[in-house]
Amino acid sequence: MSDPYMPLTSVRSGAGFEAAKGVHGLTVQIANVYFIQLPSEPHSFVLIDAGMPQSAGVIVNEAKQRFGEGFQLKAIILTHGHFDHIGAIEEILEHWDVPVYIHSREMPYVTGKEDYPPARPDSKSGLVAKLSPLFPRHSIDISSHVQALPEDGSVPFLDEWMWIATPGHTPGHISLFRDDGRVLVAGDAVITVEQEKMADVLIQKQELHGPPAYFTPDTETAAESILKLAGLEPEALLTGHGIPMTGKNFRSDLTELANRLSSI
């Protein structure tokens, strides 16, 4: 059973947006999900992450608007298993019998075997950080649908994409990259809003930040993951929280952010 609705939101909640060629985004309260279109099947897509609890209807309605009533959901790729990225997955799977893929190190958190560590409300100042002990961190069990991503870095159904291990925020966090357009779907490895601060979350103030500190137990590894992403030289940065960034100006900022995090 999914968690109850959580009254955390932003001014962009419910807004769909074209994130990159063939990639459509949707802000679900405080988190983003992405619909990646299959090039050969214009009405088919892979869903990246599954939003906040009780958001299945919003996600499905956006899919209908973007891909038509006869849309085909091929699979769901999870960047990790935190509540704001898997919130609607159980309800979605009740209606669509599709495979779910996640890094092997995240499997315990989505097969009912292990809960995430407790939140760290004092890791960084801000009201959201203070509230973080109230956020769900328990495991869900979607054993009948979930499987580990291929070890070779390929992404099922998405031949142009590769997945990259970006641990730190969680042990098996991943990001996705497509060379065409140098598009990076970062998940929470790096985000574009200071997620710890309620006011910034509410207005979606665009700034480059590391993963939410209150749910990031390994800051040093998170910094190494950001350096890895900087090395990809992305030109479109699509994050789990915040407004996407495009161009090349943010590349050096990624390196500076990693260096700043590693010194904490």
Swiss-Prot record:
Pfam families: Lactamase_B (PF00753). Induction: Expression is under strict control of the medium composition. Induced by citrate, probably via the two-component regulatory system CitT/CitS. Repressed by rapidly metabolized carbon sources like glucose, glycerol and inositol, via the carbon catabolite repression system. Is also repressed by succinate and glutamate, albeit to a lesser extent. It is an enzyme of class 3 (hydrolase). Its EC number is 3.-.-.-. GO terms for molecular function: hydrolase activity; metal ion binding. Zn(2+) 1 binds at residues 80, 82, 169, 188. InterPro entries: Metallo-B-lactamas, NDM-1-like, RibonucZ/Hydroxyglut_hydro. Its cofactor is Zn(2+). Keywords: Hydrolase, Metal-binding, Zinc. Zn(2+) 2 binds at residues 84-85, 188, 241. Binds 2 Zn(2+) ions per subunit. The keyword Hydrolase applies. Belongs to the metallo-beta-lactamase superfamily. This is Probable metallo-hydrolase YflN. It comes from Bacillus subtilis (strain 168).
